[in-house]
Curated annotation (Swiss-Prot):
Name of encoding gene: tsf
Keywords assigned: Cytoplasm, Elongation factor, Protein biosynthesis
A Pfam family of this chain: EF_TS
Organism this protein belongs to: Myxococcus xanthus (strain DK1622)
InterPro entries assigned: EF-Ts_dimer_sf, Transl_elong_EFTs/EF1B, Transl_elong_EFTs/EF1B_dimer, Transl_elong_Ts_CS, UBA-like_sf
Main location: cytoplasm
Physiological role: Associates with the EF-Tu.GDP complex and induces the exchange of GDP to GTP. It remains bound to the aminoacyl-tRNA.EF-Tu.GTP complex up to the GTP hydrolysis stage on the ribosome.
Gene Ontology molecular function: any one: translation elongation factor activity
Family matches, as PROSITE patterns: EF_TS_1, EF_TS_2
Region described as Involved in Mg(2+) ion dislocation from EF-Tu: 81-84
Subcellular location, record wording: Cytoplasm
Keyword Hydrolase: no
Protein name: Elongation factor Ts
Source superkingdom: Bacteria
Amino acid sequence: MAEVSAQMVKELRERTNAGMMDCKKALAESGGDFAKAEEWLRKKGIAKAAGKEGRVASEGIIGTYVHSGRIGVIVEVNCETDFVARNPDFQELVKDVAMQIAAAGPKFVRREEVPTDNLDKEKDIQREILKQQGKPEAMLEKILVGKMEKYYEGVCLVDQLWVKDDKKKVGEMISERAAKIGEKVSVRRFVRYELGEGIEKKKDDLAAEVAKTLGQA
């Protein structure tokens, strides 16, 4: 049987919520392979099905991305263990998220973070536009639902189309990567800087430039 370290047992316990001794035995029986150990625990009915749901993603890394010295992003992406935080797949995910923020310029991570005042203002604007277009009063609220979805796609990171594959949203991409990694993954917060932001100057579409670069990657 393979030698099983205390750290390995700790990592498997955090993944499965199974007991320490069960985790140790699973790793020993699986030759130290985490995927096989998890499968062993599931077959024995030891791994807790609800374990992942109740766990907190409190580890992770701070990722950064700078495009041509003109757009900079700092983003915090969380996972459940420091073991995964060191995983190349997780670090690649963080890089992709940072580049998405640079290219698409979201204002919030998810729609629950959008202030009510912002939503009310956007609804008023869209409602007035629809009225000027002669849309029937009875249809306004229904049309507004679609308009607000478009608004969320513009300002919320997880609702945006992924710049590397516009057939899926960023939230879907993150969920797919999280499933592959085997842990809960969550974007907590980010900051995006653009050179000269707030200063009146010649219009340069830096976001489009970043998106073009990503498309060539």
